[in-house]
From Swiss-Prot:
SUPFAM superfamilies referenced in this protein's UniProt entry, alphabetically: Xylose isomerase-like
Biological processes per GO annotation: nucleotide-excision repair; pyrimidine dimer repair; response to UV
Entry similarity comment: Belongs to the uve1/UvsE family.
Highest taxon of source: Bacteria
First-level EC class: hydrolase
Keyword vocabulary terms for this entry: DNA damage, DNA excision, DNA repair, Endonuclease, Hydrolase, Nuclease
Entry protein name: UV DNA damage endonuclease
Keyword Hydrolase belongs to the record: yes
Reported function: Component in a DNA repair pathway. Removal of UV LIGHT damaged nucleotides. Recognizes pyrimidine dimers and cleave a phosphodiester bond immediately 5' to the lesion.
Cited Pfam families: UvdE
HAMAP family: UV_endonuclease
E.C. designation(s): 3.-.-.-
Organism: Bacillus velezensis (strain DSM 23117 / BGSC 10A6 / LMG 26770 / FZB42) (Bacillus amyloliquefaciens subsp. plantarum)
Molecular function terms, GO-annotated: endonuclease activity
């Protein structure tokens, strides 16, 4: 049974390598027409260059999972900008995708919490569709849309969860099927529990990303891990990818929803051990603040457990 690990966006061990450099709309509007285009191109070029640097880094360190930054392209979905970011950077996107395919990396995106399908406002749904399309277009430009996923949360409850869930199913029909096929859902830390999110996934045929920290912060009343985990595993069978779990640990007892800089191995061990009964390879995305540093420290700590063997920088063969 293999446990594989990855991290989010920015490799902390690389110098000045943020793939999420920004160009605010306020700054954009103060520029001349030619300066605006140059600024868009310059920031996007820097973010793609740093994304490529990070991909080389994960390959070199034997880290098989990576989540792209959602902020690679500035102002990509702003209604007053909406620019063609693929054509001028087709070579860069292709180079990134080529490395992903060559080294069989598992990649993903995670749009922010405002990309949701439970809102009663049509413009919110329209913006969600636009944002999902932006992420899909980047994957498509890389040539990896058929092997990557775009992960979001169910959304808000708006005072009535059942009505909101009904709207989710209706509003989701606005999303092109080719994008929905690459979509996953994750339980959140305040509103929709693991059981509620998993139920939506089962009904809609969407893979379920289980966040163990969120499960702890927003527990399910009528289900436990022995019920949730095998059902979660089953939701991934349709797209042929390994089940995926998000890992982080609370910053403190008084801030249980906040992510700590590193992952407390003792906090996550119960869920790692629970997977042994299903003998299934699992992919884990580390969501700690120290990103790759947290991943490497955690894998080092776990590899010291009797019966666990480290196969690569981010890969463990778990004890039988």
């Amino acid at each position: 049974m293999l446990f594989r690990f990855g991290f989010v966006a920015n490799a902390m061990c690389l110098w000045d390598a943020s793939p999420a450099k920004t160009l605010t709309y306020a700054r954009y509007t103060k520029l001349s027409r030619s300066e605006r285009k140059d600024a868009l191109l310059s920031v996007t070029k820097a973010n793609l260059t740093n994304t490529l640097r990070t991909i080389h880094y994960v390959v070199g360190h034997g880290i098989p999972l990576y989540r792209f930054s959602s902020s690679i392209v500035p102002l990509a979905t702003h209604p007053d900008v909406l620019w063609d970011f693929v054509t001028p950077f087709r070579q860069e996107f292709c180079e990134i995708g080529g490395l992903v395919r060559k080294y069989d990396l598992r990649t993903s995106f995670h749009p922010n919490q405002f990309t949701l399908f439970t809102s009663p406002k049509q413009e919110i749904t329209a913006n969600a569709v636009k944002d999902m399309a932006y992420h899909y277009d980047m994957l498509d430009a890389m040539g990896i849309a058929n092997r990557s996923v775009i992960n979001i949360h169910v959304g808000g409850a708006y005072g009535d969860k059942q009505s909101a869930l009904g709207r989710f199913r209706v509003n989701l029909k606005e999303l092109p099927d080719v994008i929905k096929q690459r979509m996953t859902l994750e339980n959140d830390d305040k509103t929709y529990t693991s059981e509620e999110t998993l139920s939506v996934c089962e009904q809609e045929g969407i893979p379920f990303v289980f966040d163990y920290h969120h499960f702890y912060a927003n527990p399910t009343d009528d289900a436990d891990l022995d019920d949730i985990l095998p059902r979660m595993i089953k939701t991934w069978q349709r797209i042929g990818l390994k089940p995926k779990v998000h890992l982080s640990s609370p910053k403190s007892e008084s801030a249980i929803r906040s992510h700590a800089d590193y992952v407390d191995a003792n906090f996550i061990l119960p869920v790692l051990e629970r997977f042994r009964q299903w003998d299934t390879d699992i992919d884990f995305m580390i969501e700690a603040k120290e990103k790759d540093r947290a991943l490497l420290r955690l894998v080092e700590e776990l590899s010291a457990i009797r019966g666990v063997k480290r196969l690569a920088g981010g890969v463990l063969k778990w004890k039988a």
